[in-house]
Regions:
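Non-catalytic substrate-recognition and accessory regions of acyl/acetyltransferase enzymes
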Residues: 1-115, 141-352
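Conserved acetyl-CoA binding element of GNAT-fold acetyltransferases
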Residues: 114-124
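Conserved acetyl-CoA-binding loop-helix of GNAT-fold acetyltransferases
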Residues: 122, 128-141
């Protein structure tokens, strides 16, 4: 058995060689993605240019002619991301008619965009072995370093991908000291019948981190909620009543209020049709489901970190290559259509 490495190669779908590769492998889309659609390669070139395809290989150094073993692939689509023009003071600039259309010197690839992971397939022999996480992190790293990408989103992920994404996003964010410094403001005293305070957590600091890490708003808030919940002891979460004089219980009560605010905003259309008492009961029910799911994900996260740390101690850092261009040269390092807080009905997904 030879030395094993993994490699990620990328190419633009307007490239004929990439099209030929994709033709051979996208037969797997209807087999592994429920409701998945095979990409139409007869689209105009300007449309194909908005697609990037990442191919994932295992390479085993042996005497065989072809040491590469195909493990999976992913497609990413670029959506134009409109950003309101602002001046140095942060206020919007006045529109000026000092240019004419069309602008021949501007290409779509040079404009700010939302890069959306559309299809993501890992073949069964390589599933549940950490390969999917490594592939996801490689794609994310590439777009995190790409100046044109403003946000990295995912199109209609299934539950398995959701779990992998949550765990890896949490791990990425926890590597930032400024993220680990985010705490619940225990000095807040919510007033009965009043709106939930906006300063339970430092929202400006969170937004700065979110934009830097290019994570879509809803996904980012979920990971923040998960991270903050991890500091709450199990005994506090299981308590029948929260004692406000206990700092951790007070913190947990504020956490619950903050999460409820997001859940209500996210499902406002449905909840607004209910009577107040029914609405409050429904929010409590959904919140308990969220807590249960976060606890499950945090346990999976801790298990994954332990496994990765053990592997590093046992065999050193994993070998692998960065993302390669379709021409064989190293390329420069460089959820959803919309991740806004509202728009997705409550019954659609268990994870909210």
């Amino acid at each position: 058995m030879g030395i094993e490495t993994v490699e990620v190669w990328k190419g633009n779908l307007a490239d004929v060689a990439v099209q030929q590769l994709l033709k051979r492998v996208q037969i797997m889309v209807p087999l592994f993605i429920e409701g998945g659609v095979i990409l139409d390669l007869d689209e105009p070139e300007w449309t194909l240019e908005r697609w990037t395809v990442f191919f994932y290989y295992q390479k085993i150094e042996t005497k065989e002619d072809n040491p590469y073993l195909f493990m999976g692939y992913s497609t990413v689509y670029r959506y134009f991301h409109f950003q309101a023009a602002t001046n140095e003071s942060g206020s919007k600039k006045e529109a000026k008619a000092d240019f004419t259309l069309p602008l021949d010197n501007i290409s779509f690839s040079s404009l700010p965009c939302r890069s959306r992971i559309s299809q993501f397939i890992i073949l069964p022999p390589f599933q549940r072995s950490g390969y999917g996480s490594r592939f996801y992190r490689s794609i994310f790293d590439f777009y995190l370093a790409e100046p044109e990408t403003v946000e990295i989103t995912v199109e209609d992920p299934n539950y398995a991908f959701d779990d992998m994404r949550d765990i890896n996003d949490l791990r990425r964010l926890r590597a930032l000291p400024e993220f680990k410094a985010i705490k619940i403001n225990g000095k807040i005293t919510p007033q009965p019948e009043a709106a939930i305070p906006n300063n339970i957590v430092d929202l400006p600091a969170l937004e700065t981190i979110r934009k830097r890490m290019k994570i879509a708003p809803r996904q980012f808030l979920r990971v923040v909620e998960m991270h903050l919940l991890s500091s709450i002891p199990k005994s506090v979460r299981k308590a029948d009543e929260l004692d406000d004089s206990n700092p951790k219980m007070r913190e947990y009560g504020l956490w619950r209020l903050w999460v409820k605010k997001r859940l209500y905003k996210h499902n406002k259309d449905l909840l607004s049709q209910m009577e107040k008492e029914e609405r409050l009961d429904k929010l409590d029910e959904v919140l308990e489901g969220v807590v249960t799911d976060y606890v499950r994900l945090l346990e999976a996260y801790n298990s994954r970190v332990k496994i990765d740390n053990f592997e590093k101690l046992a065999q050193g850092k994993g070998k692998g290559k960065g993302i390669e261009g379709s021409n064989g040269k190293r390329s420069s390092p460089s959820d959803e259509d919309s991740d806004s807080s509202d728009g997705e009905p409550l019954p659609k997904r268990a994870k909210v």
